[in-house]
């Protein structure tokens, strides 16, 4: 289960409006979003939205998932501001036609790739990072020149309210719209034809979205989840590993799609790692983590009940406490976990960390490779060869050696899954490229027709030899 798994009652809000969608498409067809000046103005307005409503967004995130101001700043607002700034600085460069080399046959022509907006795009965001996972794709869609329909998650209802009420005040409402509702409203929205769909959520819901997109042959990006492995080598300092793993496992109460979902290590390392994890948890959240302002809460009762059920897997080595009234689950470590148990069959998406023992690096790699490809994979070792072996012999959306998801702070690196964890990528220029159609263009002179005679029938050995030489491939049969 992942970010877009729903189950709450639909929030009150507007369903898909034919008139709104028609108006947005008309605005795009009129070319309103194409000029650089328009895109720049909208990006600047988006930056102002983040700056002027920072406290409102922080309050909403605190109410929804108990995020501290630090977590809201680091994982939501600052990253969004960075993306806006990067797009503003590089927009003209990104938009430029990209010249490509020609062969002898097209030597006197102009060949280039033009980046064009797709048109009307739909962005569906989840509840776990409801600002980040809506605004960062939006930056790319605006920069690429699209009109956009935004669908925030109804589960993070306080953040949804801020986004729905305030964001439209900063953007051109003839080109951008926020639509509200739950699963049924989203289903209705997906019945309409869009030119691109960007979805973040679970593989289960991702398949539903992809099926809907297929009816219109709509291209799509799916940012999904999965069970992210974390391998810990015997030569590691257990306290260093514990500090880093505990921080990015329990960040946002474990409700992070790139968080480590389980640890693979030897029995010997497990015996050293468990007390080190206890030290880290106490250091980060105190003797009673329930009173810590730095530990979030589970999003709703449905997810709380699901996570409570997973506490019965294996043996609780650390934590295990819960409080339904507060939707609190303590930072928990499970040991003696079997691969067949429920905690190893679904994405946990909570502050629970199972430890699974393996006898070797090879066994760990085999364990990982017989499962679905994860969104992220982590390896800790003092031996670079071990980290490189894990990198070279596995497949995942992203990879971290001796650290967690700090790579997400680098817009020069793409975020995206592979296989069951998704398709497509974004962040930085990757977002611009995702929301742009790369159009192949060749412009030739209308004159000098005599030069074209060699490609016209009737064909003979001389034509064939010259054409093969001119296009640089004797095996080519296109001309």
Curated annotation (Swiss-Prot):
* EC numbers: 1.2.1.3, 1.2.1.48
Could you name the domain of life of the organism this protein comes from?
Eukaryota
Tell me where it resides. Lipid droplet
Keywords per UniProt: Lipid droplet, Lipid metabolism, Lipoprotein, Methylation, NAD, Oxidoreductase, Prenylation
Give the residues carrying a lipid (S-geranylgeranyl cysteine). Answer: 476
InterPro entries documented for this protein: Ald_DH/histidinol_DH, Ald_DH_C, Ald_DH_CS_CYS, Ald_DH_CS_GLU, Ald_DH_N, Aldehyde_DH_dom, Aldehyde_DH_NAD(P)
Q: What is the lineage of its organism?
A: Eukaryota, Metazoa, Chordata, Craniata, Vertebrata
The active-site annotation reads 223, 257
Its recorded name reads: Aldehyde dehydrogenase family 3 member B2
Q: How is it modified after translation?
A: Geranylgeranylation is important for localization to lipid droplets and enzyme activity.
Q: State the signal peptide span.
A: none
What's its job?
Answer: Oxidizes medium and long chain fatty aldehydes in lipid droplets into non-toxic fatty acids.
Gene of origin? Answer: Aldh3b2
Pathway(s) served: Alcohol metabolism; ethanol degradation; acetate from ethanol: step 2/2
What PROSITE patterns does the record tag this protein with? ALDEHYDE_DEHYDR_CYS, ALDEHYDE_DEHYDR_GLU
Q: Which reaction does it catalyse?
A: an aldehyde + NAD(+) + H2O = a carboxylate + NADH + 2 H(+); a long-chain fatty aldehyde + NAD(+) + H2O = a long-chain fatty acid + NADH + 2 H(+); a medium-chain fatty aldehyde + NAD(+) + H2O = a medium-chain fatty acid + NADH + 2 H(+); hexadecanoate + NADH + 2 H(+) = hexadecanal + NAD(+) + H2O
Outcome recorded upon mutating residue 469 to A = Reduces lipid droplet localization
| Propeptide, residue positions | 477-479
Q: Give tissue specificity per the record.
A: Expressed in testis, white adipose tissue, lung, small intestine, kidney, spleen and liver.
Name a Pfam family for this protein.
Answer: Aldedh
């Amino acid at each position: 289960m992942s970010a877009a798994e729903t189950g709450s009652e639909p929030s009150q809000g507007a369903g898909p409006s034919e008139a709104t969608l028609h108006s947005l498409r008309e605005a795009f067809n009129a070319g309103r979003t194409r000029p650089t000046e328009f895109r720049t103005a909208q990006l600047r307005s988006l930056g102002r939205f983040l700056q002027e409503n920072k406290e409102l967004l922080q309050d909403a995130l605190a109410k929804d998932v108990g995020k501290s101001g630090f977590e809201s700043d680091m994982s939501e607002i600052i990253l969004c501001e960075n993306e806006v700034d990067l797009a503003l600085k590089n927009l003209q460069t990104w938009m430029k036609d990209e010249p490509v080399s020609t062969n002898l046959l097209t030597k006197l022509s102009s060949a280039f790739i033009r980046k064009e907006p797709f048109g009307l795009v739909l962005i569906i965001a989840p509840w776990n990072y409801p600002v980040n996972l809506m605004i960062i794709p939006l930056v790319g869609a605006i920069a690429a020149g699209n009109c956009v329909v935004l669908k925030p998650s109804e589960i993070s209802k306080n953040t949804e309210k801020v986004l729905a009420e305030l964001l439209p005040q900063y953007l051109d409402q003839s080109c951008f719209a926020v639509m509200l509702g739950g699963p049924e409203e989203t289903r209705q929205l997906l019945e309409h034809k869009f030119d691109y769909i960007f979805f973040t959520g679970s593989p289960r819901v991702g398949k539903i979205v992809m099926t809907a997109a297929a009816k219109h042959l709509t291209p799509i990006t799916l940012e999904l989840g999965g069970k992210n492995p974390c391998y810990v080598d015997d030569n590691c300092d257990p306290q260093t590993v514990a500090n880093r793993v505990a921080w990015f496992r329990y960040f946002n109460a474990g409700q992070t799609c790139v968080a480590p979902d389980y640890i693979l290590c030897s029995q010997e390392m497990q015996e050293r790692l468990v007390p080190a994890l206890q030290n880290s948890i106490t250091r980060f959240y105190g003797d009673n983590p329930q009173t810590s302002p730095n530990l979030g809460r589970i999003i709703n009762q449905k997810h709380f009940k699901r996570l409570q059920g997973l506490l019965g897997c294996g043996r609780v080595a650390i934590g295990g406490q819960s409080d339904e009234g507060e939707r609190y689950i303590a930072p928990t470590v499970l040991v003696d976990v079997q691969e067949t148990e429920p905690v190893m069959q679904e994405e946990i998406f909570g502050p629970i960390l199972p430890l699974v023992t393996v006898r070797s690096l090879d066994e760990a790699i085999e364990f990982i490779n017989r499962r679905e490809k994860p969104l992220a994979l982590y390896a800790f070792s003092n031996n670079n060869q071990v980290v490189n072996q894990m990198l070279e012999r596995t497949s995942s959306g992203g990879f971290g050696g001796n650290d967690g998801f700090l790579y997400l702070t680098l817009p020069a690196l793409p975020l995206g899954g592979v296989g069951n964890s998704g398709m497509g990528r974004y962040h930085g220029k990757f977002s611009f490229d995702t929301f742009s159609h790369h159009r192949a263009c060749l412009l030739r002179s209308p004159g000098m027709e005599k030069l074209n005679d060699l490609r016209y029938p009737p064909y003979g050995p001389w034509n064939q030899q010259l054409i093969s030489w001119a296009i640089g491939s004797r095996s080519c049969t296109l001309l």
